[in-house]
């Protein structure tokens, strides 16, 4: 029973990994959640009113709440 569960989890993980890392020549992954036009034109204004975290501070990788120019991997880098 444990082996069956492990096999199911492994297959699900590998399937999800395949979809995430698949080459998308149309850059579809980048355009899943496009920003509004005014946010793309004025990035500083789009972050106004939202708290952001500076480099080295803890952040939420799902919310991507680092200040402009920083990427979130549990810590803004």
Curated annotation (Swiss-Prot):
S-S pairs:
52-66, 59-72, 67-76
Q: Which domain of life is it from?
A: Eukaryota
Tissues expressing the protein: Expressed by the venom duct.
Q: Which Pfam families match?
A: Conotoxin (PF02950)
Which Gene Ontology cellular component terms are annotated? extracellular region
**Entry annotated with the keyword Signal:** yes
GO molecular function (one): toxin activity
Claim: Hydrolase is one of the keywords in the record: no
Where does the UniProt annotation place the signal sequence?
A: 1-22
Q: Name the propeptide positions.
A: 23-47
Keyword vocabulary terms for this entry: Disulfide bond, Ion channel impairing toxin, Knottin, Neurotoxin, Secreted, Signal, Toxin
Q: Which family does it belong to?
A: Belongs to the conotoxin O1 superfamily.
Which named protein is this? Conotoxin Vc6b
Organism of origin is Conus victoriae
């Amino acid at each position: 029973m444990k082996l069956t569960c492990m096999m199911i989890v492994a297959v699900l993980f590998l399937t999800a990994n395949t979809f995430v890392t698949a080459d998308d020549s149309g850059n579809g992954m980048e355009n899943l959640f496009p920003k509004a036009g005014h946010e793309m034109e004025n990035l500083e204004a789009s972050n106004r009113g939202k708290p952001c975290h500076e480099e080295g501070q803890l952040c939420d990788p799902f919310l991507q709440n680092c200040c402009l120019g920083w990427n979130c991997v549990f810590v803004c880098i």
